Amino acid sequence: MQARVFLLLLGVILLGMMGPMVSAQDGKAGSCPDVNQPIPPLGVCKTTCATDSNCPDIQKCCKNGCGHMSCTRPST
């Protein structure tokens, strides 16, 4: 019984670790702008995306100055 619980927990942990790898594979080119500045860029204080695939054209899903995720142009 304990072995089953252990294997189930191990499987859940491994699946959780694979989530970031899958989302990174569908990412768009470029990198998110740096929001760790003395005066962070303004942003909509609402999450509008979860992954790059939620954003139009070349935009990426990045943290904004308000701490939420939103579509933005990648930094150059």
Curated annotation (Swiss-Prot):
- Cellular-component GO terms for this entry: extracellular region
Q: Which PROSITE patterns match?
A: WAP
Q: Name one GO biological process term.
A: venom-mediated disruption of cell wall in another organism
Its primary localisation, in coarse terms, equals secreted
Where does the WAP domain start and stop, copy by copy?
Answer: 25-75
* Pfam families the record matches: WAP (PF00095)
Q: Name one GO molecular function term.
A: peptidase inhibitor activity
Query: What residue stretch is flagged as signal peptide?
Result: 1-24
Alphabetically ordered keywords of this record: Antibiotic, Antimicrobial, Disulfide bond, Secreted, Signal
Q: Which Gene3D superfamilies match?
A: Elafin-like
Q: Where does the UniProt annotation locate this protein?
A: Secreted
Q: Which SUPFAM superfamilies match?
A: Elafin-like (SSF57256)
InterPro entries given for it? Answer: Elafin-like_sf, WAP_dom
Tissue-level expression: Expressed by the venom gland.
Which Cys residues form disulphide pairs?
32-62, 45-66, 49-61, 55-71
Q: What does this protein do?
A: Damages membranes of susceptible bacteria. Has no hemolytic activity. Not toxic to mice. Does not inhibit the proteinases elastase and cathepsin G.
Family statement: Belongs to the venom waprin family.
Name this polypeptide is given: Waprin-Rha1
